[in-house]
């Protein structure tokens, strides 16, 4: 039976929550994790620069937001990506806010090389999923001499993926709906930690 990971995630999370409630503990405590104190990062999708400007102004009005993740990899090409990112820079120029980039697998190898260098000169902290899922064999060409840390998202659905790709990445981005729930997420985090990789947890 082909059950989508999001269905597994719903069942898995419900089971973990049930066990935590039986133990009369918050789930994070039941999992042995510290109290959550992670600064909030919000994502801005691919949009025309004028829409980006409006959305950034709304988002940064929330003092809890300490970072923005910008979606690039536009079907209109990397020059359009540059316009989007430049608008974000302009809208946040007087703020102490981190800026990250998620290409969503929207670049070729050559485009990724160009954009990583360009972004590294313009405040970007890291690049997420620069290449399309399935092109992981090309990551080694980006990793050598990289100008930005490389995270993978779609290329890391399960803990086995971390073991396959850890040589050519700096971190992984995991999502419960993508990996099938808390059980697999904990495995991913443990494997990533064993390889000294950084980790992020996102939603979808």
Give the ranges of each region predicted by the language model.
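N-terminal capping/lid subdomain adjacent to the active-site entrance of alpha/beta enzymes
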Residues: 1-99, 104-106, 110-113, 117-121
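Catalytic core of soluble alpha/beta enzymes
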Residues: 72-204
């Amino acid at each position: 039976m082909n059950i989508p990971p999001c269905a597994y995630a719903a069942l898995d999370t419900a089971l973990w929550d049930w066990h935590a409630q039986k133990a009369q503990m918050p789930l994070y405590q039941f999992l042995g994790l510290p109290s959550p104190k992670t600064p909030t990062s919000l994502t801005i999708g691919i949009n025309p620069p004028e829409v980006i400007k409006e959305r950034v102004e709304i988002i940064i009005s929330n003092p809890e937001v300490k970072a923005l993740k910008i979606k690039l990899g536009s079907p209109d090409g990397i020059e359009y990506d540059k316009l989007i990112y430049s608008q974000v820079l302009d809208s946040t120029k007087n703020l102490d806010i981190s800026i990250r980039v998620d290409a969503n697998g929207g670049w070729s190898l050559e485009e990724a090389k160009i954009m990583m260098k360009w972004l590294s000169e313009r405040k970007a902290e890291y690049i997420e999923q620069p290449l399309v899922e399935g092109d992981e064999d090309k990551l080694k060409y980006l990793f050598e001499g990289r100008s930005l840390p490389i995270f993978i998202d779609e290329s890391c659905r399960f803990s086995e993926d971390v073991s396959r790709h850890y040589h050519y990445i700096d971190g992984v981005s995991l999502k419960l709906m993508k990996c099938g729930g808390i059980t697999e997420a904990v495995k991913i985090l443990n494997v990533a930690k064993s390889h000294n990789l950084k980790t992020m947890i996102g939603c979808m």
